Regions:
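Carbohydrate-binding surfaces of carbohydrate-active enzymes
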Residues: 5-53, 76-78, 339-666
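N-terminal carbohydrate-binding accessory modules
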Residues: 25-104
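The substrate-binding groove and active-site-proximal loops of carbohydrate-active enzymes
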Residues: 78-87, 108-126, 166-185, 207-214, ...
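Hydrophobic faces of well-ordered beta-strands that scaffold small-molecule active sites
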Residues: 80-84, 105-107, 143-147, 202-206, ...
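Short, acidic/polar
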Residues: 86-99, 184-190, 312-324, 385-393, ...
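Aromatic-lined substrate-binding rim segments of carbohydrate-active enzymes
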Residues: 91-166, 286-294
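Acidic (Asp/Glu)-rich catalytic clusters
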Residues: 94-101, 133-138, 194-196, 321-326, ...
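Polysaccharide-binding and catalytic clefts of secreted carbohydrate-active enzymes
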Residues: 166-352
């Protein structure tokens, strides 16, 4: 206890000193800015703000809504929503948030609030929500409601003991049983009608960090057998594909993820992964359909953890980006990007945002809403520079995020709390959120052009490769993605399911990242691809089907060397850059260091637009760089963030500094 007390006092003192230093910097800067403004040497940019009068409509990656600039009428334009979640403090501070530069919150309630007892229905949570929506509308703050099916009434578990199932994650009851489904549908029928038409209700988040890991039950077993019959048609076809000898579908067990015998690297395990993904998406669709039966135009999404969308170790959790997009009007997620404190080659964990964002945008061109944006670790005691916050939020937006609520707006003296060390303890970080939101909204029409860049290349995202090839596949994919990012290439993904449906991307290149396995139907579709196939790896790739059966047929293509455990992303980058030109992939600009060598660590994207050529730059390195931009478009640029005319040689970039340039000719 004495140790804890001393540690707590040290932590509180350090936090106070950080905050004082931050606020002194803010005060001194503001004094200088006001002095310049008074002398006519500085003009603060005008920022359009969402009026709160109409719910945004969705156009591609954008939320389009009425926004008003001071002394001007409101007009429809792209609006970015940046704010906070998730509990009592965001409710209390709604009226303060516009002055902090933010315009959205996420809050929640669940079935237990509506059904506290078996024979009681309470409308208290609905009344509180309506009051919050009214307050938010007055000040132009949007509200995302997480309907939290994980807040499930205990009396239901007592009344229906079979709902008690061993599970992972927030949803801790049997999802397959009809009793749990019926309660959730009744819950939706009660809460949606009084809320659905409020303009401040931005959207509905269906679930919090969903995963479907459950011990088998009779209902899941029944659904499993139905799915197998629909997929294979007859048991002899299944036996041929699996290399098995079952006499009927009913004989096939449903895998138990908690069993010591659980193994997805079998034909049965492969099909279980696909079944679990499709079933869980269908369960979400049940909730979405119930909402849309009452409110057809109310957007919904789910807060899927991005690593469950991309990771090989998470492929069996039931979460699939493409299937989740099918019931969503917004690509929802929960994503992580932490400051590195100088450890490693990059200043922040950027790939954890950008790669899954590109995946989500590839399966459905709708806005991304990261409704639990982890940009500061829980209980973080170290200082976080505001540049980390600014870079993370800006780049997330550039890659398609048009709404986000940051975890977490709360303050505490309890070191064990998730709120310890949160952004509410960090004045310059909180200020950075507001400034980024202002910049995104005043430049929203430019940022939208960057968001709309069409992929120039595609990478295959394959469940078969995730199951059978594991880290050999994901390691290559991550390194390839990194190399392409620092080559100025807009990256897309094509999924195995898309290929199976014959949806072949209209692009010049498809990359195959060290994957031996792909489904037979996807393989056949690749034969019809008109562009160039680039194989990244040494071994014979695409040599087996989804059930690990050897494939005699082969695909030919270009090859990049990759050896698992040896090849770095820089190795791929060095060999990739010159070959991209040969393959017809040439960004409008090239980035070099001050010695005219290719420069790694600076992510850049270019968009030819009606305004001119836009260039977005972000320095992910731990050190300042001086770069040169080579372009045919012009010899200088306007930095749209600072509204300054700048030279393209040299162009300094501090760690985690972002720039949005508009190229100009002299």
């Amino acid at each position: 206890l004495d140790y804890y007390k001393d540690k707590k006092e040290i932590w509180i003192l350090r936090r106070a000193l950080f905050a004082i230093e931050d606020m002194e910097k803010m005060l001194n800067r503001l004094k200088n800015e006001l002095k310049k403004a008074k002398a006519g040497k500085l003009h603060f940019p005008k920022v359009p703000r969402w009026t709160g009068e109409e719910r945004p409509i969705i156009e591609g990656p954008s939320f389009i809504a009425p926004a008003k600039t001071p002394n001007s009428p409101s007009r429809m334009r792209p609006v970015f929503f940046n704010g906070y979640g998730a509990f009592d403090q965001v409710k209390a501070d709604i009226e303060k948030f516009p002055n902090y530069g933010v315009n959205i919150i996420q809050i929640e309630f669940g079935p237990v609030d509506i059904f506290p007892k078996e024979d009681e229905v309470s409308d208290s949570a609905i009344k509180e929500m309506l009051t919050i929506l009214d307050r938010a509308k007055k000040v132009g703050v949007a509200v995302n409601l997480l309907i939290s099916p994980h807040y499930f009434p205990k009396w239901m578990l007592e009344k229906y003991p079979h709902l008690r199932k061993k599970r992972e994650g927030f949803l801790d009851y049997c999802l397959h049983a009809p009793e749990s489904k019926e309660l959730l549908l009744r819950y939706i029928k009660i809460i949606i009608p009084p809320l659905k038409d409020h303009p401040s209700l931005h959207s509905i988040c269906l679930t919090n960090e969903p995963v479907n890991v459950e011990e088998p039950c009779e209902y899941a077993l029944r659904d499993w057998h139905i799915w197998l019959a629909q997929k294979h048609g007859d048991i002899s076809t299944l036996n041929r594909r699996w290399g098995s000898n079952y006499s009927s579908f009913e004989e096939i067990p449903l895998p138990n993820p908690f069993s010591s015998l659980y193994d997805i690297q079998t034909p049965l395990g492969m099909d279980y992964v696909l079944f679990n993904q499709e079933w869980f998406a269908g369960w979400h669709k049940m909730l979405a359909d119930a909402i849309h039966e009452i409110a057809p135009d109310l957007p919904v999404h789910a807060k899927a953890m991005t690593w469950t969308l991309t990771g090989t170790g998470e492929v069996d959790l039931g979460v699939d980006a493409e299937l989740f997009s099918s019931f969503s009007q917004i690509n929802g997620n929960d994503s992580v990007n932490f400051y590195s404190h100088g450890v490693g080659e990059f200043a922040q964990g950027w790939i954890g945002n950008l790669l899954p964002y590109d995946l989500q945008r590839s399966v459905k061109d709708i806005p991304i809403f990261n409704s639990e944006n982890h940009i500061i670790p829980d209980r973080e005691a170290r200082y976080i520079p505001p540049a980390h916050i600014r870079c993370a939020l800006w780049q997330q937006a550039v890659y398609g995020q048009s709404a986000t609520t940051i975890w977490i707006w709360g303050r505490t003296y309890d070191l064990r709390s998730d709120s310890a060390g949160s952004i509410m303890h960090r004045p310059l970080c909180a200020e950075a959120v507001g400034i980024v939101n202002y910049d995104l909204n005043r430049l929203s029409e430019y940022v939208r052009e960057i968001q709309r860049i069409k992929p120039q290349v595609h990478i295959i995202m394959s469940n078969s490769a995730k199951v059978w090839d594991g880290g050999h596949y994901s390691d290559c994919l991550d390194k390839l993605y990194t190399a392409l990012t620092f080559s100025g290439v807009k990256i897309g993904f094509v999924t195995e399911r898309q290929l199976e449906r014959g949806e072949i991307p209209q692009t010049k290149i498809i990359f195959i990242p060290n994957m031996a396995h792909i489904s037979d139907r996807a393989f056949e579709a690749l034969k019809n691809f008109k562009g160039k196939i680039v194989i990244v790896g040494e071994v014979e790739l695409l040599s087996k089907n989804e059930y690990d059966q050897k494939r005699e047929d082969k695909l030919t293509g270009e090859r990049l060397i990759y050896r698992y455990g040896e090849t770095t992303w820089q190795d791929i980058w060095s060999s990739l850059r010159p070959r991209l030109r040969d393959w017809g992939i040439q960004p409008p600009i090239e980035v070099f260091d001050n010695k005219s060598r290719p420069l790694w660590g600076v992510a850049f994207l270019c968009a030819p637009t009606k305004y001119g050529t836009l260039v977005n730059l972000s320095n992910y390195r731990n050190e300042r760089v001086e770069l040169k931009l080579r372009t045919k478009e012009g010899s200088f640029a306007i930095d749209l963030l600072s509204n300054e005319k700048i030279s393209l040689d040299p162009l300094p970039l501090n760690p985690l500094e972002v720039r949005l340039l508009l190229l100009k000719k002299r």
